[in-house]
Amino acid sequence: MSQPIPPEDVWPTYKRLLSYVRPYWFMLVISVIGYALYAGAQAGAAQLAGYLGDTIVNPTDARVLIVSIAPLVLVLFQGLGQFMGSYSMNWVAQQIVYVLRNDVFEHVLKLPQSEYHRNASGRIMSKIIFDAQQVTSAGTDAIIVIIREGLTVIGLFSFLLWQNWKLTLILVTVVPLIALVMNITSKRFRKISRRIQSSMANITHFLGEAIEGSGEVKIFGGQAQEADRFHNVSRSFAKQNVKLNASKIASTVIVQLFVAVGIGFITYLYIHLMGEDLTVGGFLSYITAAGMIQKPLKQLTDVNVKVQRGVTGAASLFELLDTEQETDTGTYTVATKVDGNIDFEGVSFGYDPASPVVRQLNFAIKAGETVALVGRSGAGKSTISAMLPRFFDPDQGRILLDGIPLQEYQLSELRNQIAMVSQRVVLFNDSVRNNIAYGELRSSDDASIIKAAKDAHAWSFIEQLEHGLDTLLGQDGVQLSGGQRQRIAIARALLKDAPVLILDEATSALDSESEHHIQQALEQVMQGRTTLVIAHRLSTIEKADRIMVLDQGQLIEQGSHQQLLEKNGLYTQMYRMNFSEE
């Protein structure tokens, strides 16, 4: 469970959030002017109440005319001020949230892969969606109330001082009590808000798991188990919201009680101290203003919940923004394309440094060579492929491309030299064309896209789709079969035409006929480029120039398919087992 914000971090969070307001200061000034008009109209209403009392006691034509017209004037001023203030502040708040949410999303795209391993995607999504919404609430409703009701309190308080400053100073004695209540409840609000954020992240995480694994849930009869897990996290979310609302109501009632006691005491003193100087108008003006000040004070107390939730949400977003991005200290650029010579020199790596996944790897892959990595599950095959584009850096040793350490390449330059097709195919909710010509390939012409699709044996089903290349695939390519999705991903890699190609279980989701066609296409595309193949089906890598066998993160055998069979080692055992299964 996440910890509440330390008190010493609250003000820095406020300041950092307010820094997003700076570019929009002009609209903020307009908002303040508008709410100043609104506050002035409120004080004018208190004065009008007193004037109305004097008019009833001593009516004259002039007074009757004034009390008839004044309400209309006050309402016009109040409405104008409300519109100016609310429109301007809403505009500013939406700009702040727009910029903040974009900053967070762009930052997330640049996080190292290790962050995605440490944090479930649902928790990151919760920060961007839910936490940003808390900032929106603080940036719109909360700030509007703070400025509008704050200026109203100042206006009414100034009016009370003008009416009778001595009695008003007595009324001020309740302010420290109100401040004490606000301070205590603010700490509680932040603590509960942090728990609500944690509960919301759990809800998002469990929803994602249940939806993505819906097939497994049904096959294994896990509906009741998943429902029970979701009920628990959902109950926690509801429980924390009830606590937050209870604290909010309690603080509001206590503040109103203090104010009511103060007003009652002042009313008693006002009547007894004014004596003969007491007038109906003066009394009504003072008591009306004192009564009116309760409403903005109540709203300022209520808004404290939104402010604290907004600060908590902002702190969560800033925590994500402060997460270190991928380090890109490389300066080496590539004129056209690398040759594709790869060297691993004493490479060790572990997602947990205490438990290395690969240990002291030493091998070289020549340009244009096709090398297959095989081994039991967890042997480190996919880890090796993930280190080539620097998704992860070695804990020890170094990896070289054309004799140059990977860290010396600019990240974008390095990744431009690599195409990858993994077991987990990622397709976007976009057209077939934009899924093949993705990212830096988006300027590709249709002829190149169609050629890549044909080479991947994908064109035969693409041209049968209702809109061809313009057909929308839906989220994660839901409209396509597993084999079709994989062929789209292969077409994307073919279109990139990179000198280094990584195939991580690239044919795992294909049926035998599709796999046969894909193997023919891959044999052609592998020519002239360095290819690293990871496959569970050993029959798919028999034609590799070299096969490297990994066991517990170490390279134990290497050679051609026939050479390894003759050694009668681990590869032979795996091949026989694999062959019998197929």
Swiss-Prot record:
Signal peptide limits: none
Binding site for ATP: G375, R376, S377, G378, A379, G380, K381, S382
The entry's keywords: ATP-binding, Cell inner membrane, Cell membrane, Lipid transport, Membrane, Nucleotide-binding, Translocase, Transmembrane, Transmembrane helix, Transport
Membrane topology reported for the UniProt record: Multi-pass membrane protein
GO molecular function, one term: ATP binding
Catalytic reaction(s) noted: ATP + H2O + lipid A-core oligosaccharideSide 1 = ADP + phosphate + lipid A-core oligosaccharideSide 2
Single GO cellular component term: plasma membrane
Domain of life, source organism: Bacteria
All residue ranges annotated as the ABC transmembrane type-1 domain in the record: 29-309
Predominant location: membrane
Membrane-crossing segments per the record: 25-45, 64-84, 142-162, 165-185, 253-273
Cell location: Cell inner membrane
Domain ABC transporter: 342-577
EC number of this enzyme: 7.5.2.6
One Pfam family, short name: ABC_tran
Record CDD domains: ABC_6TM_MsbA_like
Cross-referenced InterPro entries: AAA+_ATPase (IPR003593), ABC1_TM_dom (IPR011527), ABC1_TM_sf (IPR036640), ABC_transporter-like_ATP-bd (IPR003439), ABC_transporter-like_CS (IPR017871), ABC_transpr_lipidA (IPR011917), P-loop_NTPase (IPR027417), Type_1_exporter (IPR039421)
Matches recorded under PANTHER family: ATP-BINDING CASSETTE SUB-FAMILY B MEMBER 10, MITOCHONDRIAL (PTHR43394:SF1), ATP-DEPENDENT PERMEASE MDL1, MITOCHONDRIAL (PTHR43394)
Function comment: Involved in lipopolysaccharide (LPS) biosynthesis. Translocates lipid A-core from the inner to the outer leaflet of the inner membrane. Transmembrane domains (TMD) form a pore in the inner membrane and the ATP-binding domain (NBD) is responsible for energy generation.
Assembly information from the UniProt record: Homodimer.
NCBIfam families in alphabetical order: MsbA_lipidA
Family designation: Belongs to the ABC transporter superfamily. Lipid exporter (TC 3.A.1.106) family.
Notes concerning its domains: In MsbA the ATP-binding domain (NBD) and the transmembrane domain (TMD) are fused.
Identification of the protein by name: ATP-dependent lipid A-core flippase
